[in-house]
Amino acid sequence: MKNSILEELKWRGLIKQITNESKILDAQNNNDAVYCGFDPTADSLHVGHLMMIITLKRFADYNFKPIALIGGATGMIGDPSFKANERVLQTKDQVEHNINKISAQLKQIIPNVNFVNNNTWLSNISLIDFLRDIGKHFNLSYLLAKESIATRIQTGLSVTEFCYTMLQAYDFYYLYKNNNCSIQIGGSDQWGNITSGIDFISDTINKNNKAAGLTINLLTKSDGQKFGKTESGTIWLDKTKTSEYEFYQFWFNQTDQDSINLLKCLTFLTKEQIDNLIKEHQNQSSKHLLQKALASEMTKFVHQQQGLDKALKLTEAFFSGDLFSLTNDLFKMALNSLPNTQINKDTKVIDALIEVKAASSKREAREFLTNKAIMINNQIIEDENTLISSFDLIQNKYLLVKKGKKKYFVILIK
């Protein structure tokens, strides 16, 4: 473990921008609080949020008191920073539901985090008070110079969204004044909002204050694509939206280069541990040691040991073909994680492949069968006229179709 949080963040290549290094080091020595904001735009966080969740946990490991600010008020508006279009406004009930779900997720991941909801203080400010006590401290030219706002001026920016940065600035002011919170952290798009908060504190409390902030680099893949999106959509932290198995597989399927970067950015493995993994992987790359370490660390962090155990058991069952020994709970996870459909027991294999979307046409299905690329319940299938009723069923009603090395589909027999 490094001597300071800044050393830790630097060797991992995480820092994008920082306002004042010495203030952050002083805050570490004084056991100050640090906060990161999460707007409740959905009822679950996703892997794109992990960079900030893990960074908040890193600060906690270095003597800071972690605060997760849930934007009960700002979530009703939506942060315009670097967004192409204005967000669709959510109802109060939607926001409240999302807050409850997200808070439960974060509490499970970072048990010692202190939750605050900015609706607690922002809802008590009248429009007149907002204009007089907050708005007068923000010069229009100052706000328009912010890159996060300037990029939206041409496409259209409502007054509602325009005020967002002032509300977030007040959040920092409030936590600084009431929670001994001197540090705000955020993603690379939050620099303008963070510096607005520091300027507001300087203007209203004391120019010689201890407020500071830093932003974290955007996580991208080695090919330049934004990290976190897949062909099947968003990878959620909620296991009812993305199962532990799917979550594990998402990390396991990263490239070698991306795995190395992700191990540095998102895990708590030391530099020595990561360097040793890289050496071992280079000597026996077929074992995918980097990917296994990454998938295990991330799944355990989000879903605890129990979730990792489930993911590993299901992964092993798919690899070995021993699906008949799976518990009902694990097979339900497989069913929820894979494309599946109901098919009549008298259906031929060639038609079943199309129905379950393992093939787009009979011609393509025949190609797969000819090339021995189709397995049903771990048995290679070549005859297109085989009836699916001829196979032993898993739990008396399921068949598992494997296409190639990694694609799985589940057939439920009617």
Swiss-Prot record:
Instruction: Name its cellular compartments.
Output: Cytoplasm
Which residues are ATP-binding? K229
Q: For this UniProt record, give its keywords in alphabetical order, as a comma-separated list.
A: Aminoacyl-tRNA synthetase, ATP-binding, Cytoplasm, Ligase, Nucleotide-binding, Protein biosynthesis, RNA-binding
Amino acids binding L-tyrosine:
Y35, Y164, Q168
> Is Metal-binding included in the keywords of this UniProt record?
no
Enzyme class, spelled out: ligase
Give the EC number: 6.1.1.1
Q: Which GO terms describe its cellular component?
A: cytosol
Tell me where the sequence motif 'KMSKS' region sits in this chain: 226-230
InterPro entries per UniProt? aa-tRNA-synth_I_CS, aa-tRNA-synth_Ic, Rossmann-like_a/b/a_fold, S4_RNA-bd_sf, SYY-like_C, Tyr-tRNA-ligase, Tyr-tRNA-ligase_bac-type, Tyr-tRNA-ligase_bac_1
Q: Motif 'HIGH' region at which residues?
A: 40-49
The S4 RNA-binding domain, residue ranges: 347-414
Gene Ontology biological process terms from the UniProt entry: tyrosyl-tRNA aminoacylation
Q: What SUPFAM superfamilies does the record point to?
A: Alpha-L RNA-binding motif, Nucleotidylyl transferase
Which GO terms fall under molecular function for this chain's record?
A: ATP binding; RNA binding; tyrosine-tRNA ligase activity
Q: What is its main location?
A: cytoplasm
Q: Which reaction does it catalyse?
A: tRNA(Tyr) + L-tyrosine + ATP = L-tyrosyl-tRNA(Tyr) + AMP + diphosphate + H(+)
- The chain's disulfide connectivity reads none
Please explain the role this protein plays, according to its UniProt record: Catalyzes the attachment of tyrosine to tRNA(Tyr) in a two-step reaction: tyrosine is first activated by ATP to form Tyr-AMP and then transferred to the acceptor end of tRNA(Tyr).
**Which PANTHER family does UniProt cross-reference here?**
TYROSINE--TRNA LIGASE, MITOCHONDRIAL (PTHR11766:SF0), TYROSYL-TRNA SYNTHETASE (PTHR11766)
Family listed: Belongs to the class-I aminoacyl-tRNA synthetase family. TyrS type 1 subfamily.
Q: What is this protein called?
A: Tyrosine--tRNA ligase
Organism in which the protein naturally occurs: Mycoplasma mycoides subsp. mycoides SC (strain CCUG 32753 / NCTC 10114 / PG1)
Coding gene? tyrS
